[in-house]
């Protein structure tokens, strides 16, 4: 569709980009196409997809198998909280040398845990990675441990993307952490509190 092509043309080579597209407009396909373009041009060889619990499995069973071009060899693993030997073997394949795109899909809650953070850090240190947050309002609370952890991880991601149809759920301050994930300089404020002091009138 034309709107998807427009979004892809504007975003594909940017280090950071927000897909603020309404539900049903195909933003997931745009992101996967963007990932494929960066891989084909040698810009990335890894992807860390962070999604809410309700849709994280869909990325693994439907979105990536449907939209990732068939010519791209890939190793795709869905993170599990309880790591069995089989799961560990799958995770280990993400670090094997060779060609191909390495993709890990993680529930956003996993990045509240030491186990999830340690793995994500290792993955980012070993790959040129696109890190994408599906339903990015899941990181709107700057005090939440998962938000702080994800903002830390973002520093090591070569490309960063966020996606949501509703970037503001309660008030405009919801935007701070989402934009900070993309690039701290987008808002000209490196602190949530200085951002709030500049733009918000707090009521008691």
Model features per residue range: what roles?
Residues 1-21:
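Conserved pre-motif I regulatory segment
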Residues 14-34:
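Walker A/P-loop
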Residues 19, 49, 163:
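Hydrophobic anchor at the beta1->P-loop junction of P-loop NTPases
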Residues 28-30, 43-66, 169-174:
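Conserved Walker A/P-loop ATP-binding site and its immediately adjacent core
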Residues 134-136:
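Walker B catalytic acidic pair
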């Amino acid at each position: 569709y034309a709107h998807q092509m427009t979004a892809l043309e504007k975003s594909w080579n940017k280090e950071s980009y927000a897909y603020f597209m309404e539900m049903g407009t195909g933003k997931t396909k745009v992101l996967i196409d963007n990932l494929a373009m960066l891989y084909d041009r040698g810009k990335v060889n890894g992807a860390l997809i962070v999604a809410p619990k309700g849709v994280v499995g869909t990325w693994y069973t439907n979105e990536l198998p449907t939209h990732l071009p068939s010519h791209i060899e890939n190793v795709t693993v869905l993170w599990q909280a309880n790591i069995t030997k089989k799961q560990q073997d799958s995770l280990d394949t993400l670090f094997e040398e060779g060609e191909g795109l390495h993709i890990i899909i993680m529930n956003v809650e996993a990045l509240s845990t030491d186990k999830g953070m340690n793995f994500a850090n290792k993955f980012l240190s070993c790959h040129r990675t696109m890190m994408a947050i599906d339903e990015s309002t899941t990181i709107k609370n700057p005090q939440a441990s998962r938000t702080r952890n994800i903002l830390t991880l973002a520093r090591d991601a070569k490309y960063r993307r966020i996606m949501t149809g509703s970037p503001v759920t309660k008030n405009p301050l919801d935007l701070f952490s989402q934009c900070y994930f993309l690039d701290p300089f987008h808002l000209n404020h490196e602190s949530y509190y200085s951002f709030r002091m500049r733009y918000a009138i707090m009521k008691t």
